[in-house]
A protein has these predicted regions:
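TM-loop-TM module centered on a large, flexible mid-protein loop between adjacent transmembrane helices
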Residues: 96-97, 103, 135-151, 161, ...
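Hydrophobic alpha-helical segments and their helix-loop junctions in multi-pass secondary transporters
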Residues: 131-141, 223-252, 315-321, 431-448, ...
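Membrane-interface loop-to-helix entry segments
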Residues: 130, 188-242, 299-303, 420-433, ...
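A generic transmembrane alpha-helix motif of multi-pass inner-membrane proteins
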Residues: 421-422, 426-427, 456-504
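Hydrophobic, membrane-embedded alpha-helices of multi-pass small-molecule transporters
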Residues: 29-48, 190-203, 236-239, 254-308, ...
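Extracellular loop-to-transmembrane helix junctions
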Residues: 26, 50-162, 166-169, 178-179, ...
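Membrane-interface "cap" regions at the ends of multi-pass membrane proteins
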Residues: 1-52, 56-61, 74-79, 88-91, ...
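C-terminal membrane-solvent junction of multi-pass transporters and transport-like membrane proteins
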Residues: 188-191, 203, 385-397, 431-479
Length: 590
């Protein structure tokens, strides 16, 4: 009785797919296109926000060291992605890499997890784009209706002289301290975030029209934001005061993570997320002209250029203004103000750069997700409709339309905080699996030609995986619970649909009933069936209640505040194993 859930896709089959020019995608991307694609995915508004805030709270001028540490740590994962992308130039990214090393079930988990990284990221960043666009239009005296510029149900209040803003407890406290009667102000609730929905719809249409057109748009956005960053850095150097860099490493306050070397490492963890996005380059592998050579250049080149820009921004920003003054939503704008009235013209240009940066990030995320859907559909784990390629545009138009539609709905109704944390944990999980997969494949298939080789294996992959796991551990418990719920849904889809439609499973005549996993599921199914047939009813109810109490009690100890989420996870842990077993064995018992 062997393992069937972990069937590995033959790597030769992937290499044959990569060599097949009839896959449908247009091979139009050069090394330059791939590099700008990576920069487009990495550099968003974070460079204008995280740099100042991390310096003010954790590291001071030594934020420069934090960027170097974080860049090196992210490069560990980048090196692993570069080896895989050059060796297996298929659009599936981490999903495909896991399929060749860890098997189908774990590949499905990663593919399902990547939805959190790409689709949810597109929605998250589009909400940020909306905020910058509303602010930019206000500078031009163009005012959008407040009810259509925030997530559905968001409580808004109209502050005289400021306009409509989101009501928060801190804002109410601040207004009350200033003698303003908050109850007397106008209140309303947002309906949907129209600007966020608009940018997703526009970019989805662009991606359907063609990869070449999308790459050209991305190039313009990247040139715009990088150009503005370089202008700010050059001008800012003339306003640097060396006194602002002293002490370069502020002494620790006595609390871990607040300045000193512990603050440098804490800041490195915070700004790590400013590097996320380079992996999206690997989803365009089948559209690269020379993927074996150009994919590593695109992945590592974009990481290197972004790191240099981050470091230069950190040096200038902490040099023109003392770091304690950077704890604001727009630290770069504060830095521009410190240069004097003559430099006021830079403020709207910074906003334009932020809009360009966010636009390119949304584009890259919307590009990556449909190509992962396409690859999963080719493997039979998703319906075949997801693998359709437009005859004229040669893009996965059905997957692109679905991705865009779901992203539009999420961006229109959900707040950015929930979306952002799910993106972070989903991305880190994918990075971890890719790092581990490199070690597996080096041992299993050392004979495969590798145009690019990750150095110092297994040290580099292990360091990459450890750093990512460490970052995941720092995320809130409720984010982990949301991830578990998301994975429960994925398990159901896999066992109800994907395991039956898998191309490899059908081709090899996989019989789950005769596998180790089948024996376990059969036991679960039999146990629950007996439980549900117990009489009297009170015994049945008590048994089910007991099964619910065990996980609920554990979650209550870990996180006592989220009652509804505890109930949901406990119910999932109790019911989902039965649903999975039932879906597999219902035909056997029928």
């Amino acid at each position: 009785m062997g393992s069937k859930l972990f069937t590995i896709k033959p790597i030769q089959e992937l290499l044959d797919e990569a060599a097949d020019n009839k896959q449908g995608f247009k091979k139009a991307l050069t090394a330059t296109n791939l590099t700008t694609l990576g920069i487009g995915g990495i550099i968003g508004a974070g460079i204008f926000v995280l740099t100042g805030q991390a310096a003010a709270q954790y590291a001071g001028p030594a934020i420069v060291i934090s960027f170097i540490i974080s860049g090196i740590a992210c490069a560990f994962a980048g090196l692993c992605y570069a080896e895989f992308a050059s060796m297996i130039p298929i659009s599936g990214s981490a999903y495909t890499y896991a399929y060749t090393t860890l098997g189908e079930f774990l590949a499905w988990i990663i593919g399902w997890d990547l939805i959190l990284e790409y689709l949810f990221a597109a929605s998250t960043v589009s909400v940020g784009w909306s905020g910058y666009m509303v602010s930019f239009l206000k500078d031009l005296h163009i005012y959008l209706p407040a009810r259509f510029t925030a997530a559905s149900g968001t409580n808004l209040i109209d502050i005289p002289g400021t306009g409509w803003v989101t009501r928060t407890a801190d804002l109410v406290k601040d207004l009350t301290s200033k003698g303003i009667d908050v109850a007397a102000l106008q209140h309303t609730h947002a309906i949907m975030n129209v600007p966020a929905m608009f940018i997703i719809a526009f970019l989805t249409l662009l991606l359907i029209i063609g990869i070449k057109e999308s790459a050209s748009f991305n190039n313009v956005m990247v040139i715009t934001k990088v150009g503005v960053i370089i202008v700010f850095v050059i001008i800012g150097f003339f306003f640097v005061k060396s006194a602002n860099w002293k002490p370069f490493i502020p002494p620790n306050t006595g609390e871990w993570g607040h300045f000193g070397w512990s603050g440098i490492f804490r800041a490195a963890g915070v700004i790590f997320f400013a590097y996320i996005g380079f992996d999206a380059v690997s989803t365009a592998a089948q559209e690269a002209k020379n993927p074996q050579k150009d994919m590593p250049i695109g992945i590592l080149g974009s990481l290197g250029i972004s790191t240099i820009l981050y470091i230069l921004m950190a040096i200038v920003l902490t040099g023109i203004i003392a770091y304690p003054h950077l704890l604001v939503p727009d630290p770069v704008a504060v830095g521009v103000n410190s240069m004097g009235d003559k430099m006021f013209w830079l403020r709207p240009i910074i906003k334009i750069a932020a809009l360009a940066g966010l636009s390119s990030v949304v584009l890259v995320m919307l590009l990556g997700q449909p190509r992962i859907f396409y690859t999963m559909a080719k493997d039979g784990l998703l319906p075949k409709v997801f693998s359709r390629v437009h005859k004229k545009f040669r893009t996965p138009y059905i997957s692109s339309m679905l991705t865009g539609l779901v992203a539009i709905i999420l961006a229109g109704i959900l707040p950015i905080s929930i979306l952002g944390e799910l993106v972070s944990i989903g991305t880190l999980l994918a990075f971890t699996i890719v790092c581990i997969s490199i070690i597996f494949l080096r041992k299993k298939r050392p004979d495969i030609p590798r145009p690019f080789r990750t150095p110092l294996v297994p040290l580099i992959p292990i360091l990459g995986a450890l750093f990512c796991v460490g970052q995941m551990a720092s995320l809130p418990v409720d984010t982990w619970l949301r991830l578990l719920i998301w994975m429960y849904i994925g398990f159901l889809i896999y066992f109800i649909y994907s395991i039956r439609k898998s191309v490899i499973g059908l081709r090899t005549g996989r019989d789950l009933y005769r596998s180790k996993e089948g024996a376990i599921l059969a036991g679960v199914y039999a146990g629950y069936s007996k439980l549900f047939n117990v009489t009297p009813m009170i015994v049945r109810l008590l048994a089910i209640l007991f099964l619910l109490i065990i996980p609920y009690s554990l979650l209550w100890v870990l996180y006592p505040k989220l009652v509804i989420l505890r109930l949901a996870v406990s119910a999932g842990l109790t019911i989902i194993p039965y649903l999975i077993a039932w879906s597999v064995f219902r035909t056997k018992s029928g």
